[in-house]
Structures are given as C-alpha cells and as structure tokens.
Amino acid sequence: MDELTAIHKGLFEGVFEDAGKLRTSNTTREVTNDRARAANPEAFFPAGLIETGAHNIAMELADKRNLHALDRDVFVHAFASIYDELGYLHPFRGGNAMVLRIFGSRLAHDAGWDLDWGSVAREEYRSAKHSAYRGDTSALETMFDAILRPANPTRVFLIAGWNQGPAH
C-alpha cells in the first residue's frame, strides 16, 4: 500500500487535496450514460477494508514471487488477475487508473517485462477493465499480451519524492 500511496502522492500532490490518502467512503464505477451499466453499478472494494485488501494482494504477489521468472503466457494470466484485483481495490477517490498503470508497469518491469501503453486505446482499456470487474479477465490478458515485451534493463521509473527502494 505504501508504494501505491507514494505514487498517488507523487502524481497528484497539488492537484487533489487528498493526494496520497486512501478514500474513506464506498464508491461505485464511474457515472455513465450507458443504461445497462448505470442500471447495475459495480461497487469497488469497501473503503474500510482497503488496507486489508492491499495486504492480501501483497501476500498473493509474495506467494507468486512478484511474478518473477514466469513464462510469457503464465505471466500475462497472473498479471491480468493481479491488475484486476488492484483495479477493484480502487484505493483513491481519483487517479486510480494512472496509479495502477504505473504500479503495474513497475511490477512487470521488475518481473522481466515492459508494457508499451502507447498502443492501448482508452476505450480498449476501459472495456477490458469493466469485463474484468464482471469476472472475465480475457480482454485484459489479450491487451497485456499485445503490449508486453522483454524488459529493457536500462529503463528506470522515476517520480519525484517516491522512494523506489533499491536501484534497478
């Protein structure tokens, strides 16, 4: 959770009053004009349990050795699942998608893969996330498979004020 809050604070300090702070109220997916979606809003993880949920995801990642040394197809499947869980966690009032992309990119990089987000259209991303919220991560897997490549060891993720741990 510390890394997610540090990323959020680094990105949104001076933009959001609550930058780096967990949301304190329950929320659903964004307001939409799509009647089918609006008629059945999907709630995110309960606000009072965010830290517990984050701990559970961290334990899952630890059990899976942070997705290190996995073959591509196994990595894509496991990464899509973790990405979905983090999306459902939705720890902040705003800015979750950007935080998730950065955290996910770092997780992938540390596991030996890089993600090229430049080729992902906004609607493709949103559609894949919403399908995953309903239990189908196949669109996320397809998207990640298309943008995944072996890691460039010289790539570094820098965000001012974010303690990134040991140098890569």
Task: Please provide the spans of the model-predicted regions.
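FIC/Doc superfamily catalytic core
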Residues: 1-168
